[in-house]
């Protein structure tokens, strides 16, 4: 036989258990940082989007010839990029080139930082030429690359971005990419790399 006292004890026990359970859930929510990106694939989507944008910039610039023109924006007398210190640009790519304008419009103006590097081979070593350096990439950085073939008869650009009469063959050792085939028309094959991350 169940007495009224025993029924009240069960009710009290149930209320105490529910309070304990709700308190545990409330505590767990307070100690765990819950953000829109927690437990989702949003970070990966952002990285993928940044990578696709950088790849699209490189592909479109390669298709219309302005990717190579960006690589030819070189001051052979100073032996570095026009208007940049020896270690590249630190505030975005130069606006005098289509590549620079497009990278700045597509990435920098939208809160995405980027580094632009060119890789080439010299004496069996892979060398990196830093074109734009906007900082150390985050752990969630994305990378896009494009391969470009440079020829001896490609002409360097002046500070305004207009082609000069100086070819890569004329520039000789003053250009950063060594002549991989001195007896042939190819100067070298380089890999253009854009590393992107949110600022």
What are these model-predicted stretches?
Residues 1-37, 53-54, 194:
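Secretory targeting signatures
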Residues 29-199:
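Long, compositionally biased, intrinsically disordered regions
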